[in-house]
Amino acid sequence: MTAIIMIAQLLVGLGILVFVHEGGHFLAAKAFQIRVPKFYLFFNPSISLVCFKKVGGKWRVKFFAKNLPDTEPVVDENGEPVLDEKGKQKFKLINLDKLPEDDWRKHPENTEYGIGWLPLGGYCQIAGMIDETQSVENLATEPQPWEYRSKPAWQRLIVVLAGVIVNLIVGVLLFAFVLGHYEKEYLPLEAVTDGVYAFEQARNLGFQTGDKIISVDGKTFERYQDAVSAKMYFGSIVTIERDGIQKDIVIGDEYNLLKSSNGMFLQPYNFPALVDSVFPAGEAQKAGIQKGDVIIGLDTIVIESYGALIEYREQFANRSVEVSYLHGNDTLSSLITFDSTAMLGVAIASMPYQTKTYTIGQSLHYGWSDAMKNLWLNLKGFEKLFSGEEKLTSLSGPVGIAQIYGGVWNWAKFWYITALLSVILAFMNVLPIPGLDGGHALFTFIELITGKKVPDSVLQYAQTIGMILLLLLMFFVIGNDIFKLFK
C-alpha cells in the first residue's frame, strides 16, 4: 500500500506540474494565433490512453488510439519507393484533402488533447517549432502565418519561456497556500528569547547554546526559519548576541556540513524537555514517567534542553539507560531500554514561544521568498555538481521523487513538495541546453541581439544533440534510482 501511495502522489504531482507547464506554452501560443496541433499530459509513444478533439463542430473521443502519421512514403509512377541520396525512403506530408472528413488529421486548426501512458513528462506541440514533435517534412515547407517560425522573435521568446514562468508562479502560489492553509503560524526570530540550541557541528564553528541570532550578512529577518536556513551554509557572517554582547561568526562554504548535519545545526530547541504525553505501553510509561515530568539526564549526560535530548539520545539506541527526570520537586531516575530508533516513548511539549498567524499578504510574500530561496539553493547545487563537489549519483529521478513524497498521503507535505518541484522544473527548463526551453530562448536571444535568425539546419542539429543528451541523462537518473533501491 505504501508503494501505491508513493506512485499515486508522484503521478498526481507530476501531472499537475506538466499540465501547468505545457499549459503556459499553450496559452502563449494561442495568444499569438499559433496553432497547437497536440496537447498531451504524459508521453504517448505509438498509442494514447485517451484523446479528444473537436471535429466537424463536435467533440470526438478515442480510447487506446494509435498515433496516426502526418507523412506517407514517396513512390514513383510504378508504385516503387523513392529513395534519397543516402538510400533511405523518402516521405512527404499527407494530402489532407484526400483524407475522409472524420479523419482527425483533416482538421489541423483544432487541438488534439490527450493523456499518454508514459508518465515522464508531456508536451505541447507548437506548429512550426523545431523540436522533437516536428517532422522534417513539416519544416521543409514554407512558413505559414499560423506557425511559430513565422512570428517575430519577441513573441517566440514569450512562447518558449511561458512554461517556465507559469511553473514559477505556481510554485510561489503553492508555497503561499501551504503557509496560509496548513502551517498557518510562524515562529518570529525575536520570539526565540532563550536563544538557539547549537548542535555539535554548529559548536565547532563557534556557536554556543543560548546564542540569539541578530542578523545574517547584515540582514534582519522576521521569521526564524529565514535566518537559520540552508543559505547559511554557503558562506555568511552571522551576528549573534551572547551574554548581552554582539559578535560575528564567519561561516565559510560548508556544503558538506549541510549534507551531513541533516538539519541538526541550529534549532530553537533551547527549552526544557517537558513531557507533554506518554505513549501507552511504552518504556517510559512502564518506568513511571508522567505528563509534566522534565527529562534532565541520560546516563551521566546532563540534559538541560530538548535540543540536548535530541542530540545525545541516539548513542543509546538498543541500550538500557538510566534516565533522570524531575517529578514535581523530586528528582527521580529509572532504567529504560531504548529501541533501535532511540525513542524514549514520550512526546515533548511544543516550543514555549509565541507564534504569529500568517496573513494573506504574508503568505504571498513568504511564498515568493521560499520559492526564491529554493531557486538559489538549486543554483548552488548545480555549481557544486559542475565543480565536482557533488556527484552525479546524487541526482534523483522518478523513483527518488516518489520516495520524497513518501508512503503516507499528507496534503501539506504533498503540496509543499509539489511547490518545490515546480520551482526546480522552472530552473531546469530555463537552462540554455538545446531541447529545453532555455535552449530555444538562447537561440531567440541571439536573433534579437544580432538581428539574424539562426539557420534551421543549426537548430535541428542542436535539437537532436540536446535530446540525445537529455535522454541519456534520463536513463542515467532512472538507472541510478533503481540501483539505490537495491544498494
Regions picked out by a protein language model, each given a short descriptive name:
Residues 178-222, 261-297, 301-304:
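PDZ/PDZ-like domain segments forming the peptide/carboxylate-binding groove
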Residues 461-481:
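Final/C-terminal transmembrane alpha-helix of multipass membrane proteins
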Residues 141-154, 262-286, 294-297, 301-427, ...:
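Functional transmembrane alpha-helices
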Residues 3-139, 428-450:
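Small-residue-rich helix-interface/hinge motifs
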Residues 9-13, 19-20, 31, 122, ...:
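Internal alpha-helical transmembrane segments
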Residues 159-192, 227-277, 285, 322-324, ...:
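PDZ/PDZ-like peptide-tail recognition elements
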Residues 129-136, 193-254:
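Juxtamembrane extramembrane loops of integral membrane proteins
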Residues 21, 115, 202, 210-213, ...:
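Terminal peptide-recognition signature
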